[in-house]
Amino acid sequence: MEKFEILDIAGDVGLKAFGESKEEVFVHAALGMYSLITNTDVLKDQKSITVSIESHALDGLLVSWLNELIFHFDAYGFIGKRIVVSEFTASLTLPPQRGGMGGGEAFRLKATVYGEEFDPEHHEGKLLIKAATYHRLKIEKKDHVWETEIIFDI
């Protein structure tokens, strides 16, 4: 099974990611996104970051996850090569927000991303991704395989 495929969309770029589990499709979506930024084959495991994300919806978790990784690239130049998920929890209960609103079911993802700082002298620059979007976003299980389609603003 392939991990991801790039989608050519007028004015934007997207990808489809595949996995045998929700965790795996999230990892493959992130690796696909990184491949849009640079050639990930030449990256080294020199540094690591730990990312923890919570959301009330699975699709929101995916968008938040990818946007957090984009933030680490924009702010610190960090780009990942390998990802290890340490926690993926579905349907836990979040406490209500201030004012009593919110709470209810949620999803949590915690992962360590291994990679290095992007160096334009050593790494090929491809696309500058601004954000993962909800446009045409879907995440579903088809024939025992999890699949997501996500569009990025560039």
State where each predicted segment sits.
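Glycine-biased, low-complexity coil/linker segments
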Residues: R98-G102
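N-terminal intrinsically disordered, cationic/polar leader segments
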Residues: E2-A90, A106-I154
